[in-house]
């Protein structure tokens, strides 16, 4: 299984990075699609995500085109890069304890 995650961001705060840390190690790659208008964007401190080096793709177009547009971009990227599964997440999504590992076992079985 090759797993791409996508998180759709809209005015993200620092909690997003903590949420990402709960599942990033289990993903092959993670696309962060920012729907925040370009004039309001701020950089997230992704350097603290040790499991993210080379795994995080930052994207967006500087305007809010909605969830569908971001998901379409993720699907196109997944197909072009040999991913077998796509995990869609909201910026508030997080996993506690070993919940994500249990989730992956369920998908594989």
Question: Regions from the language model: what does each represent?
Answer:
Residues 34-45, 63, 93-94:
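A conserved acidic beta->alpha catalytic loop
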Residues 83-92:
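Short beta-strand-to-loop acidic/aromatic patch adjacent to the donor-nucleotide binding site
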Residues 93-106:
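Acidic donor-binding/catalytic loop of UDP-sugar-dependent glycosyltransferases
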Residues 16-17, 39-48, 98:
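Acidic helix N-cap motif at the loop->helix transition within catalytic regions
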Residues 61-78:
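Glycine-rich, basic loop-to-helix element that forms the pyrophosphate-binding segment
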Residues 2-4:
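Cell-envelope/extracellular polymer assembly enzymes that use nucleotide-activated donors
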Residues 109:
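A short, conserved acidic/glycine-rich loop-to-beta-strand motif
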Residues 9-26:
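Short, well-formed alpha-helical segments that are part of the catalytic scaffolds
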């Amino acid at each position: 299984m090759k797993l791409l995650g996508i998180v759709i961001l809209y005015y993200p705060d620092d909690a997003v990075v903590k949420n990402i840390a709960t599942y990033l190690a289990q993903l092959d790659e993670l696309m962060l699609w920012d729907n925040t208008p370009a004039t309001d964007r701020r950089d997230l401190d992704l350097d603290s995500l040790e499991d993210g080096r080379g795994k995080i793709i930052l994207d967006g177009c500087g305007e809010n085109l909605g969830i569908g547009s971001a998901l379409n971009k993720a699907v196109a990227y997944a197909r072009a890069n040999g991913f077998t599964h796509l995990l869609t997440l909201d910026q508030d999504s997080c996993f506690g304890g070993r919940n994500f590992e249990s989730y992956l076992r369920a998908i594989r079985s």
